[in-house]
């Protein structure tokens, strides 16, 4: 058991949100003093995660080529680099030409497509030199069909009624592991330990963290690995119980709720109801991962432009300001406008035709430097502001003298809003630099977003 008493209470006692005004004229933030003794999981409260798709990141698709982008990602402001799985991919029952990252045939080796173990070590070292953290995508649920365990330790695997090793859904390229067996769990944890000891990574993004994987696996994993160093654990699962052991969980429900609003299936008011429900289920302390895209959404559901249309910026502002820990997927910051092939080579075009880099840089910086927007109990609880329009979402967040006010038109039509005492005075819209007279604000353009720092 590790998370709340150690990570949350320590921060509260350390006074992480003892804030002082920032010196810059545009009031970007009131700087917060971070505790000297804070661990990485604690410090993640004001960080942004960046998902790295090595295969598609450069024409070469290697760690060495990716290293050239590290200074740019540092300038973007992202501080946690999540690498999709980097291990060798199975050949038996492989999907496509290159196969899925998530069909692993050796947990303790590097996919030669990406480079060598030494190459990855160098990437981690360079990231650390730039003050960034590295977490590795970990796939404990299944292996490739040509993983050595298939023949040497078939008892590690789940079997059907006929005694045959089984797979899940249409994932025909993977064999399902049985984590009710202590030997399976031990071998998996040993492999995770290898990457910490050999490459000095800072944590794990835990693929498919629930369902077939019992919570006691994560209890054993954190108990065995947390003493090695301060680790950050991100679960690809949307269930409160995961926070008994892990730091952050996917907020799939809010992601899909935003997509429903963009499609016109739900209103902004209904989106806020989803937020209230989420807070009721999880409380305010856990880190909830928010995003508008990731490798799954991009490959199978569509680009942000397909799913959000002209509203992609407004929904990005929402994910960075409502609560939780935000994430940017490879290429999102330059307007990636294609579904990246999942089993083939499909390089990202890094030409920022839509001019989005500065937009995302501003969002990352805003959240980094304003304690009101930090994750969990380190930031403020969102408070809805009534503007008498179901398509407009207005809210504020406050924390220790910091306050951010957000107004979002989440529709493709002009919207009228009612006056509210909380909307008063003339302020600068942080995102555009324009002055906004809140007292006289009556209409919002389609997908207009206003962010005020008070």
Task: Identify the residue ranges that each predicted region occupies.
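Bacterial N-terminal signal peptides that target proteins for export
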Residues: 1-8
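Bacterial N-terminal signal peptides
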Residues: 9-16
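Carbohydrate-interacting/catalytic domains
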Residues: 19-82, 88, 126, 272, ...
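Active-site-proximal helices and loops of the catalytic beta/alpha 8
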Residues: 27-32, 197, 207-291, 307, ...
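Substrate-binding/active-site clefts of carbohydrate-active enzymes
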Residues: 34-64, 68-79, 85-199, 217-227
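Hydrophobic faces of well-ordered beta-strands that scaffold small-molecule active sites
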Residues: 48-50, 81-83, 134-136, 204, ...
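Active-site beta-loop-alpha junctions enriched in small/polar residues
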Residues: 55-57, 86, 139-141, 209-211, ...
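Conserved short secondary-structure transition element at the edge of the structured enzyme core
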Residues: 316-334
């Amino acid at each position: 058991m590790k998370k709340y008493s150690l990570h949350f209470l320590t921060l509260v006692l350390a006074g992480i949100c003892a804030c002082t005004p920032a010196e810059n004229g545009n009031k970007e933030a009131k700087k917060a003093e971070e505790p000297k003794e804070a661990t990485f999981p604690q410090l993640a409260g004001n960080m942004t995660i960046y998902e790295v798709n090595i295969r598609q990141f450069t024409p070469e698709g290697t760690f060495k080529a990716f290293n050239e982008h590290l200074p740019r990602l540092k300038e973007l402001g992202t501080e946690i680099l999540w690498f999709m799985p980097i291990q060798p991919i199975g050949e038996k029952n492989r999907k496509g030409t290159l196969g899925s990252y998530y069909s692993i045939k050796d947990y303790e080796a590097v996919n030669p497509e990406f480079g060598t173990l030494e190459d990855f070590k160098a990437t981690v070292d360079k990231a650390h030199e730039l003050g960034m953290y590295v977490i590795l995508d970990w796939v404990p649920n299944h292996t490739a069909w040509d993983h050595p365990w298939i023949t040497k330790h078939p008892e590690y695997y789940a079997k059907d009624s006929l005694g045959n090793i089984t797979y899940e859904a249409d994932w025909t390229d993977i064999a399902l592991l049985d984590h009710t067996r202590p030997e399976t769990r031990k071998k998996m944890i040993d492999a995770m330990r290898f990457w910490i000891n050999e490459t000095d990574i800072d944590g794990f993004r835990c693929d498919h963290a629930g369902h077939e994987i019992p919570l006691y696996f994560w209890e054993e994993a954190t108990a065995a690995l947390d003493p090695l160093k301060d680790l950050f654990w991100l679960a690809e699962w949307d269930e409160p119980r995961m926070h008994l052991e892990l730091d952050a969980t996917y907020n799939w429900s809010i992601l899909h709720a935003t997509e429903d609003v963009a499609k016109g299936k739900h209103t902004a008011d209904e989106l806020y109801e989803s937020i209230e429900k989420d807070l009721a289920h999880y409380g305010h302390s856990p880190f909830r991962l928010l995003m508008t895209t990731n490798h799954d959404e991009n490959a199978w559901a569509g680009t942000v432009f397909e799913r959000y249309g002209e509203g992609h910026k407004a929904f990005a502002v929402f994910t960075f300001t409502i609560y939780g820990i935000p994430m940017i997927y490879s290429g999102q910051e330059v307007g990636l406008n294609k579904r990246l092939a999942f089993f083939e080579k499909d390089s990202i075009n890094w030409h920022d035709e839509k001019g989005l880099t500065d937009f995302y840089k501003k969002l990352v910086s805003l959240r980094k430097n304003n304690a009101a927007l930090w994750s969990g109990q380190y930031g403020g609880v969102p408070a809805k502001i009534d503007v008498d329009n179901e398509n407009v979402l207005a809210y504020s967040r406050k924390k220790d003298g910091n306050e951010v006010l957000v107004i979002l038109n989440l529709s493709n039509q002009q919207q009228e809003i009612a006056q509210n005492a909380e909307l008063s005075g003339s302020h600068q819209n942080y995102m555009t630099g324009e002055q906004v007279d809140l007292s006289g604000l009556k209409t919002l353009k389609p997908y207009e977003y206003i962010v005020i720092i008070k």
